Amino acid sequence: AIFEAQLGDDVFQEDNSVNLLETKAAKLSGKEGALLVPSGTMGNLVSFLVHCPRGTEAILGNKSHTFSYEAGGISAFGGIHSHQLHNEEDGTIEIQSIKNAIRHDNIHFPKTALISLENTHNKCFGYPLSKDYLDSVADIAQENNLKLHIDGARIFNATVALDISLSTLVENVDSVTFCLSKGL
């Protein structure tokens, strides 16, 4: 079977398997496009790099995977400052805390560019973040000219728990990562 497998360079969109997977992921998420990367950590890093110019900051939970387990990649590779806020037991960050943490043009601080949430939240007992909560945070992001990213390594667990499609759950977020080795 390996001798009959179709081969191609995915850089030139010649790998049919990758093309089909990316097309399916874009359709499932309701997003314009999708990109296959080797790990969720890399997916998060790519998303942060797209949304955050060097020297800006991202608001994320103090128990988030990106902050806790991704080796400081956003700082090391992107020059992105992480502004950690307290994660509640259910994985949320208090709405008012998010609003209060946003920093605009002030020479003393990095400018906020991104809010990142995790759904479901690994270190917060796997609770799913509701559509209403995501939409509330998306509203804050839009009102402040920020982007909203979802680390969705386990997002399919959230869709099952909430009985909602992925595209509906993330329709108001700017980017979402998901892992093909978890929750399928």
Where do the protein language model's features map onto the residues?
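Conserved PLP-enzyme active-site core in the AAT-like
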Residues: 1-5, 11-184
